[in-house]
């Protein structure tokens, strides 16, 4: 992934490919794009979308919502049954670490 597969584009080097396996899904993050796949079938469920879309609830001018600076980390907390996704924001101001946690094990639009 990261070489045009499933709509991922490689726009930086290295591609900073990162992923995690959850209860029913696999989350793949390649630099600035994130996608969700079915763990059982491998089918694309959502995305790829720009990683900063995960942080739009912070407001249109918040650096985490505006910047999509990459170096993502996708993790699944098996004990809590939640996804934890991070990326940094360093463009145009002080650095931020953008962190988003899911409300349950099923990653989909709106449940982060």
What is the meaning of each model-derived region?
Residues 1-112:
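C-terminal PAP-associated
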